[in-house]
Amino acid sequence: MKRAVVVFSGGQDSTTCLIQALSQYDEVHCVTFDYGQRHRAEIDVARKLAMQLGARAHKVIDAGLLNALAVSSLTRDNITFPGYEDSAGGLPSTFVPGRNILFLTLAAIYAYQVEASAVITGVCETDFSGYPDCRDNFIKALNAAVNLGMARELSFVTPLMWLDKAETWALADYYHQLDRVRHDTLTCYNGIKGDGCGQCAACHLRTHGLAAYRAQPQAVMASLKAKTGLH
């Protein structure tokens, strides 16, 4: 039996990864991390989506220590979220140092216990917003380290790594789930489900990606298929 663990926040990217994983694996588990994020609604959104989409299990893991160690606008009310115009150059205030190092390592431990062969994460280098822990070389390096430390072959799978946001929307549409991803996920830094606030950097990427897909759906879908091998 092919099993996978999806690092699941309830946002656009991880939900799209979950949708695809459910079509590719016999059993899919979700792990969501409670790290003291400002908008707790994302945990509730993740719970609901995991159940609705049919994940075998959904585990919420306490990662509160990250909040104590890493200062970020995602965890501190007194730090302002960046707008899109503020996101160019340098690390944005939304960067949480060590977040993906911790999340992927904990997800790998869970995968070890349930005998999963893959940990799936929605990180993307094309739209990575300056986060160093979303880069392909980082994911591969951590994957190698985890495999050495656990003496077991586990794959860190990144379906969105080389896709832009338009192609990520196309991927959701490929599985006939675009409307669910649009209306039921929470990506907005200001904690607004669906189309979000429209002002933060996350909403800008999401909104402009959807507009780009809708403007040229056939071309974007063809690009997606060329990159991923989907038919």
From Swiss-Prot:
Disulfide bonds: none annotated. ATP binds at F8, S9, G10, G11, Q12, D13, S14, T15, T16, C17, L18. Keywords: ATP-binding, Ligase, Metal-binding, Nucleotide-binding, Queuosine biosynthesis, Zinc. GO terms for molecular function: ATP binding; ligase activity, forming carbon-nitrogen bonds; zinc ion binding. It catalyses: 7-carboxy-7-deazaguanine + NH4(+) + ATP = 7-cyano-7-deazaguanine + ADP + phosphate + H2O + H(+). Zn(2+) binds at C188, C197, C200, C203. Pathway: Purine metabolism; 7-cyano-7-deazaguanine biosynthesis. Its cofactor is Zn(2+). Its EC number is 6.3.4.20. The keyword Zinc applies. Binds 1 zinc ion per subunit. Coiled coil: none annotated. GO terms for biological process: queuosine biosynthetic process. The keyword Transcription regulation does not apply. InterPro entries: QueC, Rossmann-like_a/b/a_fold. CDD domains: QueC-like (cd01995). It holds the Pfam family QueC. Catalyzes the ATP-dependent conversion of 7-carboxy-7-deazaguanine (CDG) to 7-cyano-7-deazaguanine (preQ(0)). Belongs to the QueC family. NCBIfam families: 7-cyano-7-deazaguanine synthase QueC, PRK11106.1. This is 7-cyano-7-deazaguanine synthase.
